[in-house]
């Protein structure tokens, strides 16, 4: 892989990871149209995701630090027998909710082979349909009334709903940020809180997925070009920070609908291309079969 390709994929990952348009879907399309090897592209995609993970840690370093602090204090309170004897702080409550949102991701392990096969195949029809699902969620969230819930008023059922949305976002074309922010808004979360909750929720998911994929790649003997991977990761980090600032601005200024329109148009085009490709493939197969019969 060239350095230019690594930079372009890093920029694409950094922008689309946080903009509600599906980074995995865009990377899948990029790799499909450029013909990049599917196995090596999976490990390279992991490195790009680690770059965006660092972007979240930097952008939300205050809340992330407080949540880490509460995580260790939680164990201290557990050993001292006072875990439920005092009122939870807002960050302790947010920590509980984030843990609850991660529970649906346990289903990823038995479904990992299916998800990987969909992500690495040469059929873009699935990506197109998933882009349309993202668009539908964004349109629904755009029409939802403004919510006012935060960590102090958010309920467990809301956390689970957001977690289920994140589970489905493992499919390429369904935006993780778009689906979790949209479901958060539909659950009545305040918009800026929905954004921060969504991005922070992605930290354990991205980290766990990265560790699993790198382990599988190492076990299978799939190599990775560390030089280009680190360059791509740096590009993803820089443009990820820019994208986070843009998302915060757009959601506060009621301009999120632009992404619903974008994913609707993109999804429609990809679905049409996918259908045309399937029809062409069927016709080619049919002609090849006729020629073979003629030869015989």
PLM features: residue spans?
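Small-residue-enriched transmembrane helix starts and helix-helix packing motifs
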Residues: 1-17, 131-135, 151-167
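Conserved small/polar residues in nucleotide/adenosyl-binding loops
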Residues: 284-291
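Hydrophobic alpha-helical transmembrane segments in multi-pass integral membrane proteins
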Residues: 167-174, 269-279
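Interfacial loop-to-transmembrane junctions
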Residues: 241-265
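Membrane-interface helix termini and inter-helical loops of multi-pass transporters
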Residues: 112-121, 215-225, 279-283
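Hydrophobic alpha-helical transmembrane segments
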Residues: 7, 95-99, 128-132, 160, ...
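Interfacial segments of multi-pass membrane proteins
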Residues: 5-13, 26-44, 165-168, 179-201
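Membrane helix-loop-helix hairpins that form the core translocation module of multi-pass transporters
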Residues: 32-143, 210-213, 243
């Amino acid at each position: 892989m060239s350095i230019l390709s690594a930079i372009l994929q890093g920029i694409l990952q950094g922008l689309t990871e946080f903009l509600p348009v599906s980074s995995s879907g865009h990377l899948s399309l990029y790799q499909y149209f450029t013909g990049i090897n599917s196995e090596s592209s999976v490990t390279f995609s992991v490195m790009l995701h680690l770059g965006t993970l660092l972007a979240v840690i930097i952008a939300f370093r205050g809340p992330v630090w407080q949540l880490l602090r509460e995580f260790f204090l939680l164990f201290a309170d557990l050993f001292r027998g006072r875990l439920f004897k005092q009122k939870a702080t807002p960050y302790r409550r947010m920590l509980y909710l984030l843990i609850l949102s991660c529970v649906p991701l346990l289903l990823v392990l038995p479904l990992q082979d299916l998800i990987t096969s969909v992500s690495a195949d040469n059929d873009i029809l699935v990506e197109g349909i998933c882009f349309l699902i993202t668009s539908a969620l964004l349109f629904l969230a755009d029409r939802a009334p403004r919510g006012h819930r935060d960590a102090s008023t958010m309920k467990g059922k809301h956390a689970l709903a957001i977690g289920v949305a994140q589970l489905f976002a493992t499919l390429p074309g369904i935006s993780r940020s778009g689906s979790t922010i949209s479901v958060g808004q539909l659950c009545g979360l305040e918009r800026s809180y929905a954004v921060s909750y969504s991005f922070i929720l992605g930290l354990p998911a991205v980290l766990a997925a990265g560790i699993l994929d790198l382990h599988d790649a190492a076990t299978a003997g799939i190599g990775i070009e560390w030089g280009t991977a680190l360059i791509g990761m740096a590009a993803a980090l820089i443009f990820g920070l820019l994208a986070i600032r843009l998302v915060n601005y757009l959601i506060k200024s009621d301009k999120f609908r632009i992404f619903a329109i974008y994913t609707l148009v993109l999804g429609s085009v990809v679905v049409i291309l996918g259908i045309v490709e399937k029809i062409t493939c069927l016709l080619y197969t049919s002609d090849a079969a006729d020629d073979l019969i003629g030869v015989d």
